Amino acid sequence: MSSGVVADLFFMQSPPNGERAYIKNNAGPDTRNNRNYTLEPKTVTVENYRTKLNSESITLDTAGFQLFSNRPTQFIKDGEVQVEGYYDESITLLKELTGASKVVIFDHTIRRRRPGESGDNPDKRQPAAIAHVDQTFKATIARVHRHLPPEDAPGLLAKRFQIINLWRPIENPSDRLGLWRYAISLAGETYGVKYNERQRWGYFKDMRPDEFVLIKCNESVQDGSVALYTPHTAFADPTTPEGTPFRQSIEIRTLVFYD
C-alpha cells in the first residue's frame, strides 16, 4: 500500500500592508478581487494514513479527525443526495460515534469538481484547494447563538461543545482531502493556514461512499488535553490515473453538544 504522495498544497500569505485578511465568498465569477491576501504553493509529502489505521492516535480527540468505514448511507443513490434523510442519519451517527447529547446541522456543501466552473451555490461548490479551518472559536460561539434558540444557548455554551464536519465521497473512490494531523452574506470567521515545515499532512487513499471522515473545526476544551481543530484542504493527487472521474463529495457542518 502506498505510503504517500508528493503534491502541491496552497497556504495563506498575509496581506503585505498589515490588514486583517478577508475573502468575499459571494462576489461573483470574477474572483480576482475577492480577497486581500495571496496564496503560496508549497510542495509537501502527503502521507497515506491508511497505513496507520491501527494506530489509536488518529481520533477526534488526539488528532482532530477520524475515519469511519463500513458505514453505507441509504440516502445517496446514483450521485444524488436525499438531504433530509441524510441529515437525520448523520445526526444519529454523530451521537453514536461521539457520545454527544445534541447535534445540530447548520449547513451542507456538495462539491463536484467541474473545471472552469465557480459559484457559491451549496450544491455546486468546487473543492476548497487552500489549507484552512472552517471556524475560529469566536465564530463557533456565534454559530451557537445563530442556530439555537436564545434561551438554550447559555446552557449549551456552559458545557462542552464542538463544530464537527462529516465529509463523505458521493460516488467515485476519492482521496483528495488533505488533513493536517498535528493541528492546533453574513460575515463569518475562519483560520487561514501559513506554511510551516513542522506540519505533517496526510490523507486516506481511495475513500469509498461507505466511508466518511469526521473533521473537528473547533472545540470548547482549550486546556491542551484534546486536539482543537484540523486544518484541511483539497489537493491534486499526482498519482491519479488519466481519465479518472472527478471528485464528488458531501460535507455537513454540525454543532455538537455534550451533557
Give the role of each language-model region.
Residues 189-259:
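Catalytic core of Fe(II)/2-oxoglutarate
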Residues 1-6, 257-259:
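Basic/polar N-terminal segments that are highly enriched at the extreme N-terminus
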Residues 3-190, 198-200, 205:
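Non-heme Fe(II) oxygenase catalytic core, chiefly the N-lobe of the double-stranded beta-helix
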